[in-house]
């Protein structure tokens, strides 16, 4: 089964199996097919996939890099670019990213910059990558530890979403992606919020429910990205929870997984929305807490403590460190005017005169963060 269910801002197909030669019909066998992945995916998932692609007559070039956020760097990027040159890859080639969000970010940035742009296909293998990272054409790498400081907008020619890959993941890894879905519910689609409340763990055991869930989330992301492909206004609502999350990831030097950082980031940012008077319904904070807890997602910085190396822990003792790191967020117009997404009510972000980002009062930001940091320092 191949279901072409999204065409804007780019094609997305929902497939039962990657082992279908019809999927590859638009990729010429006259030029190399370059697979970008990480070493973990290459070992656990790729062998049968590579065997199938090879049987179709492609000259396959596999380029991998070590897994993890700490390896989404300029140095790895340049190394991969050099390997493309060493293999004689030219404009007619296709780059295919197979993996989670980090792999897809790297593959997209490589494809957009090599020869000023070569054909790109994406095959996400994690929940986060399926419902978020693979949709919309954003890519990027970190620079000096700062999240996605370098990147482009480069839509793939096609994305193939195959839920079968999720069987290779632990339940915890599935839940990393659930945080992005909760975000979709908060900023744009209250139906997703109700869906998660209603089905809960059934999501992990029913393929029918899972398929509906994945498609709905992909469609939400696609609709928003199509309306604002270059992330100038409306698309910024998808950064809810990510302003704080990226600061936490930076300070931990990649040791806090993105999905867990986003979960905590959403709780902190929704509290800031409430304290700022933008969100009027305090019960939404409790609802977010309960929904996150249903999927074993953290809601406080203290819950992330065990993931942070001991020699980095002091960075989370004082709110000033987080606030300083927030100054480097790419949404900011300057490092003195911090901006983040504020929730007005469930399914709606405060429009803020069309920017969809607000600058919280420093006193409110400080006090909310201080409460989080005090818990880390004192426990």
Swiss-Prot record:
Subcellular location: Cytoplasm
The protein's required cofactors: NAD(+); Co(2+); Zn(2+)
Coiled coil stretches, renumbered: none
Catalysis: reaction(s): 7-phospho-2-dehydro-3-deoxy-D-arabino-heptonate = 3-dehydroquinate + phosphate
Gene Ontology cellular component terms for the protein in this record: cytoplasm
An example Gene Ontology molecular-function term: nucleotide binding
Pathway membership: Metabolic intermediate biosynthesis; chorismate biosynthesis; chorismate from D-erythrose 4-phosphate and phosphoenolpyruvate: step 2/7
EC number: 4.2.3.4
Cofactor note: Binds 1 divalent metal cation per subunit. Can use either Co(2+) or Zn(2+).
Binding site for Zn(2+): 180, 242, 258
Main location: cytoplasm
Annotated keywords: Amino-acid biosynthesis, Aromatic amino acid biosynthesis, Cobalt, Cytoplasm, Lyase, Metal-binding, NAD, Nucleotide-binding, Zinc
A Pfam family matched in the record: DHQS_C
Enzyme class: lyase
List of residues binding NAD(+): 67-72, 101-105, 125-126, 138, 147
Gene Ontology biological-process entries: amino acid biosynthetic process; aromatic amino acid family biosynthetic process; chorismate biosynthetic process
Family statement: Belongs to the sugar phosphate cyclases superfamily. Dehydroquinate synthase family.
Summary of the function given for this chain in its UniProt record: Catalyzes the conversion of 3-deoxy-D-arabino-heptulosonate 7-phosphate (DAHP) to dehydroquinate (DHQ).
Protein name per UniProt: 3-dehydroquinate synthase
Organism: Chlamydia felis (strain Fe/C-56) (Chlamydophila felis)
Gene behind this protein: aroB
């Amino acid at each position: 089964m191949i279901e072409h269910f999204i065409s804007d801002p780019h094609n997305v197909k929902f497939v039962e199996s990657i082992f279908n030669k019809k999927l590859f019909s638009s990729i010429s066998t006259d030029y190399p097919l370059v697979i970008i992945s990480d070493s973990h995916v290459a070992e656990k998932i790729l062998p049968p996939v590579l065997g199938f692609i090879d049987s179709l007559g492609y000259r396959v070039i596999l380029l991998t890099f070590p897994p993890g956020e700490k390896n989404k760097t300029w140095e790895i990027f340049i190394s991969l670019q050099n390997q493309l040159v060493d293999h004689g890859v030219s404009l007619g080639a296709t780059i295919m990213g197979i993996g989670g969000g980090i792999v897809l970010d790297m593959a997209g940035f490589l494809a957009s910059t090599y020869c000023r742009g070569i054909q790109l296909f994406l095959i996400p293998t994690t929940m986060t990558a399926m419902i978020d990272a693979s949709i919309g054409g954003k890519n990027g790498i970190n620079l000096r530890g700062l999240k996605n400081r370098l990147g482009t907008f480069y839509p793939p020619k096609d994305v193939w979403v195959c839920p079968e890959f999720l069987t290779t993941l632990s339940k915890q890894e599935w839940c990393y992606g659930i945080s992005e879905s909760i975000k979709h519910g908060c900023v744009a689609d209250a139906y997703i919020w109700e869906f998660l409340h209603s089905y809960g763990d059934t999501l992990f055991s029913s393929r029918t429910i899972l398929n509906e869930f994945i498609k709905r989330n992909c469609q939400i992301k696609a609709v928003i990205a199509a309306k604002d492909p270059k992330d100038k206004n409306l698309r910024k609502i998808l950064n809810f929870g990510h302003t704080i999350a990226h600061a936490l990831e930076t300070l931990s030097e990649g040791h806090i997984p993105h999905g867990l950082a986003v979960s905590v980031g959403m709780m902190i940012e929704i509290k800031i929305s409430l304290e700022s008077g933008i969100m009027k319904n305090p019960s939404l904070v409790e609802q977010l807490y309960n929904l996150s807890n249903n999927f074993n997602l953290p809601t406080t910085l203290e819950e992330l403590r065990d993931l942070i190396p001991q020699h980095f822990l002091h960075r989370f003792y004082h709110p000033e460190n987080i606030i300083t790191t927030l100054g480097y967020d790419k949404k900011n117009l300057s490092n003195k005017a911090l901006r983040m997404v504020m929730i007005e009510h469930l399914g709606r972000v405060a429009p803020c005169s069309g920017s969809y980002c607000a600058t919280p009062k420093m006193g409110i930001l400080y006090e909310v963060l201080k409460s989080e940091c005090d818990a880390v320092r004192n426990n």
